[in-house]
């Protein structure tokens, strides 16, 4: 490990690895570090991802594909089923990944591009001089290092310390985080071509239950509950999950379990300071509805890698420059989608089960294969006029999208 690099990336998840790869491909000297001894482990993710969006960033390798899905099925509290084709099911439906292999592959891509990759290496603090981030203090195998870099990219996940060290407010209120529990089960009787989502205040208050098939009778089965609806004197996510699994898969065996939190807050006020950018869950760039963050993280990582090159090449790594080449760009793309999802989330978390049943009933006969956003919203909210008003901004956005496609 050297003392000086162009770019130091802290965290080797999808956001960090894509940022490191992109910067290295531009000819920058990049160090990518990961605090764990194995990249991609433990997995804290349902592992679903949209095919076409994924192909924007990587060439598909079957070694990290567990299942190729046709679509998704959503079940309302009374069991009403809404089925959607994969193309319009959202960012988490398409492929089911083996994240342990996938994340390592992304880090390998960064290494092949020229980045230096170090595992079991954690940041213990930032080097800040004259109000500029100049690098970080690292710990590797019990030895301390001081590594300087022209730009630091914080990709250290939902529990990010890098942002706090830099003075960025990344705090989350209970309502802004989904507390999650997930089992990998074997011996499950499950349709291998569809993922399933179950909603309702009895089954997952403020969240949902998911099932992602992984082939050969295996599946990720998990639940996310809003943080303000669990805790002391309230059932825990694992309690909801156990209840669901016992009823749905009485003969299945649990072979792995993971627990964690997912930010569903929407984007934070700023994701950069002098000499530093935040990406992925560290920047709260996950989808506020689903909690899914792989694709948003990869998008932001790519933008950050390109921004690092532009800023360093210009000799200007100030906040003003990073706002121009990173902040502005990701907010106009990924950030816009996050803002729209947050509007939907804030409306839906207050719906009663009978409202959810009514909405599902209005959609159960809809042919989703060819439906556009505007058509979907029209059908969805015939059953709930108040919700239609609360989400009126989405209709305006959908109308703009229709007009843009016509020009």
Curated annotation (Swiss-Prot):
Q: Where does FAD bind?
A: 15, 34, 45-46, 48, 99, 123, 281, 293-294
Free-text remark on how the cofactor is bound? Binds 1 FAD per subunit.
The EC number(s) given in the record are 1.3.7.11
**What would you give as a GO molecular function for this chain, any one?**
oxidoreductase activity, acting on the CH-CH group of donors, iron-sulfur protein as acceptor
Keyword rRNA-binding (UniProt): no
NCBIfam families, per the entry: GG-red-SF
More about this protein:
Reduction reaction proceeds via syn addition of hydrogen for double bonds.
Q: What is this protein called?
A: Digeranylgeranylglycerophospholipid reductase
Q: What is the lineage of its organism?
A: Archaea, Methanobacteriati, Methanobacteriota, Stenosarchaea group, Methanomicrobia
